[in-house]
């Protein structure tokens, strides 16, 4: 069986400064791997390179054993992304947003899928509202719905609960737990929230200054480094 996501020797240099330095890791099927580290450590740059939004200075990204740089269009349905920092089209309704993304990924039974996601993510009351008028928590749930509308085998999460109130953040984490178990999705979660990583991830990569400084289970790393030093 091919590995859903593999990163090999990935580096990114900006103006002679290395933002990411020769990192390698795998995310196996039905596994959630966390990247934990402070702001500026290279988490978002790493995700940007995996998505193809940033061109690596060196190294490669494989999806199911295929180098994504060479087969990006063919691999479109295998990979999706969630981030609170990516804006949704503001003038479309929630339903229109989901229809656009569903058609982009050629989702079968799109109407049923939108109804399912609306129920699971509590979107029924806002389904016909203009996206630009929604609260940050509502936008977060819409972003989550559009990113999983095609049930991608690999999902990248960049600070998925950032700026959410505790109740909404807990709801999103609970949904992700249930969804991942049901679909056996391979997830890479970038966060600086230790509690979030501990709850969701089976293994963690600790990043600092663009490098992976340690990796292992959350239990092992907490014992080794101390919770305070990992937050």
Where are the regions that the model predicts?
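Catalytic Walker B motif of ABC-type/P-loop ATPase nucleotide-binding domains
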Residues: 155-159
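Conserved ABC ATPase signature
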Residues: 130-134
């Amino acid at each position: 069986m091919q590995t859903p996501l593999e990163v090999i020797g990935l580096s990114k240099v900006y103006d002679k400064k290395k933002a990411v330095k020769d990192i390698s890791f795998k995310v196996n099927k039905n596994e959630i791997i966390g990247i934990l580290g402070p702001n500026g450590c290279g988490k978002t740059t790493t995700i940007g390179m995996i998505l193809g939004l940033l061109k690596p200075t060196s190294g490669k990204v494989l999806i199911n054993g295929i180098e994504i740089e060479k087969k990006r269009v063919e691999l479109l349905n295998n990979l999706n992304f969630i981030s609170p920092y990516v804006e949704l089209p503001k003038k479309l309704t929630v339903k229109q947003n989901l229809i656009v993304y569903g058609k982009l990924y050629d989702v079968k039974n799109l109407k049923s899928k939108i109804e399912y996601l609306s129920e699971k993510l509590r979107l029924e009351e806002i389904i016909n509202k203009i996206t630009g008028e929604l609260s940050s928590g509502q936008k977060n749930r819409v972003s989550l719905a559009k990113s999983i509308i095609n049930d991608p085998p690999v999902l990248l999460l960049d600070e998925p609960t950032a700026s959410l109130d505790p109740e909404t953040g807990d709801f999103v984490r609970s949904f992700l737990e249930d969804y991942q178990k049901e679909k056996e999705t391979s997830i890479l979660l970038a966060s600086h929230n230790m509690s979030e990583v501990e709850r969701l991830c089976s293994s963690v990569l600790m990043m600092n200054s663009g490098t992976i400084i340690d990796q292992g289970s959350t239990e092992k790393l907490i014992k080794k480094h101390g919770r305070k030093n990992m937050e």
